[in-house]
Amino acid sequence: MPRMTPSEAFVETMAAHGVTDIFGIMGSAFMDAMDIFEPAGIRFIPVVHEQGAAHMADGFSRVSGRQGVCIGQNGPGISNCVTGIAAAFWAHSPVVIITPETGTMGIGLGGFQEANQ
């Protein structure tokens, strides 16, 4: 089996689970994954605020009956998703939220946008 990058494994997993649309903000933590969404048949729908991405994933789920997926940047980006994810939780919508984390060697050192997730 050929070796994959973490981004390739992430995109392959999303495609294997039938994900066709992902809502989120394009950012440095996901740049390499963004390049391989389209070849995998995944459409990235950009938003201007992570809260909108979470609400859009919830709405997508409610209308389509499939899982909604949103991406938030680490730290403050993911905290912006809380309201939309709470709405999805109470509506019993199958929404998946994905966020990066500070690299293992940098955890606890106050890295860029590090937050206790």
How should these model regions be labeled?
Residues 1-117:
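N-terminal alpha/beta PP-like core and its mobile active-site loop of ThDP/TPP-dependent enzymes
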